[in-house]
């Protein structure tokens, strides 16, 4: 009974920690979006994207509103988006997207995570050529004629479309475009009133790397350490 309780408690705390990290990431995204385009989502496509992501994560409305209010104030911390590059064990390329108010702290922490987990932090451009920055939309596929939608969206920047599975096993329709077409495709999806669950820019690996189970575990230990860092927003890699 005791062990079962401890296991459940550990699982619960892990879920809470993951949720807290996700809410912190969204709050920073809100701050960056508001600084770039103002607090009114009607006039700020970047903020609309972040609010979609917040709803998908079930972030409480009061927390979202508080984040927008803070971001609109004079005392809001100014976050800088900085991307770091490096290699995980076994030559896996890694891109680390951060949002920081202290670059000196962040670069030191990212370098430490690479070093402590068998990787090497690289210079700008050392692995970026192995990725392509893209706009990625995830939608609920129910009621969508995918063939018709694909033809319809090609003129708005769509490059790739396919089905995937979410963390909870739910079916997702994933749509990708060049990063330069992100806003155009977002507008097209909004105009068609489709159920967009999330919309983010991602570094998509061009040539995924296959590894054995033990080697992959070593890579994912580094990824996990990076994702736990308070300044890290996203970690992208080319592990298949």
From Swiss-Prot:
Listed Pfam families: TACO1_YebC_N (PF20772), Transcrip_reg (PF01709)
Keywords: Cytoplasm, DNA-binding, Transcription, Transcription regulation
Compartment(s): Cytoplasm
Keyword DNA-binding: yes
Gene3D superfamilies found in the cross-reference section: 1.10.10.200, 3.30.70.980
Highest taxon in the source lineage: Bacteria
Major location category of this protein: cytoplasm
GO BP terms: regulation of DNA-templated transcription
GO function terms (MF aspect): DNA binding
Gene Ontology terms: cellular component: cytosol
UniProt key word Transcription regulation: yes
HAMAP family: Transcrip_reg_TACO1
Entries under NCBIfam families matching the protein: PRK12378.1, YebC/PmpR family DNA-binding transcriptional regulator
UniProt similarity note: Belongs to the TACO1 family.
Record's protein name: Probable transcriptional regulatory protein AnaeK_1694
Species assigned in the record: Anaeromyxobacter sp. (strain K)
């Amino acid at each position: 009974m005791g062990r079962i309780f401890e296991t459940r408690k550990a699982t619960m705390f892990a879920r809470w920690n993951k949720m807290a990290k996700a809410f912190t990431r969204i709050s920073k995204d809100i701050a960056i979006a508001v600084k770039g385009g103002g607090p009114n989502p009607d006039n700020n496509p970047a903020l609309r994207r972040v609010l979609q992501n917040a709803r998908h994560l079930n972030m409480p409305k009061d927390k979202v509103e508080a984040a927008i209010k803070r971001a609109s104030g004079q005392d809001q911390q100014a976050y800088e988006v900085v991307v770091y590059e490096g290699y995980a064990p076994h030559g896996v390329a890694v891109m680390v997207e951060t949002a920081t108010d202290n670059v000196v702290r962040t670069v030191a922490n990212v370098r430490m995570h690479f070093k402590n987990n068998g990787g090497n932090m690289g210079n700008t451009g050392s692995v970026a050529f192995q990725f392509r920055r893209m706009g990625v939309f995830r939608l609920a596929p129910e009621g969508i004629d995918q063939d018709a939608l694909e033809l319809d969206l090609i003129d708005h920047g769509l490059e790739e479309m396919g089905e995937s599975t979410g963390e909870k096993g739910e079916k997702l329709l994933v749509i990708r475009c060049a990063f330069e077409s992100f806003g155009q495709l977002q507008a097209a999806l909004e105009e068609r009133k489709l159920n967009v669950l999330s919309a983010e820019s991602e570094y998509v690996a061009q040539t995924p790397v296959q590894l054995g189970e033990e080697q992959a575990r070593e890579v994912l230990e580094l990824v996990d350490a990076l994702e736990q860092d308070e300044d890290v927003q996203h970690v992208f890699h080319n592990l298949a």
